[in-house]
Amino acid sequence: MKRRSEVNNMNKIILSILTVIMLTGCNKSLNDPLSQLRGKVIVNGEQYTMILSDYEPKEDPVQFISKHSSDINEIAALFDTLKVEKGTLFKFDINSDPSSITVTKLNEDGTTDLVETKDNEITMPSESGYYIYQLTTIGSEGEQTFIFDVIVE
């Protein structure tokens, strides 16, 4: 009988330790701003999570966090390239509710264009090709950069 009591006490101690470890791990992820920053592109009702490449917190502008390589092509390779038709409308959903969004398009020939946005929406080009889009958002959290790529057919 005494042995069973010792086993129960050990189980309680182990369970308590595991609970503390799990709560500590969960608390850390809740305080990590990078884990909370999300940007989605919505195409024909489907949502796709963009790649967060850079983050500069508002409260510490000296701190610059780069999650990936500085090569935009390598970052775009992490996104599942979308195939869309010419003129398709894309809508952005950024969970940090930014006050401004700047969209830059990288063309196949290496040139870049600033893309006009209206109501967090852009229209795909009227020319077929491969394009990488970079969204720079500024909001209460700071500045974030998101990447996604498309093939326009």
PLM region spans:
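C-terminal motif of bacterial Sec signal peptides marking the signal peptidase cleavage site
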Residues: 22-25
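Positively charged n-region of N-terminal signal peptides that target proteins for export
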Residues: 1-13
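Mature extracytoplasmic domains of secretory-pathway proteins
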Residues: 55-110
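Bacterial signal peptide processing site
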Residues: 27-29
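Surface-exposed, short loops/turns at beta-strand junctions within beta-sandwich domains
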Residues: 122-131
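Conserved structural position at the C-terminal beta-strand
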Residues: 135-137
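Edge beta-strands of extracellular beta-sandwich domains
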Residues: 143-153
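Short beta-strand segments within Ig-like beta-sandwich modules, predominantly Fibronectin type-III
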Residues: 111-118
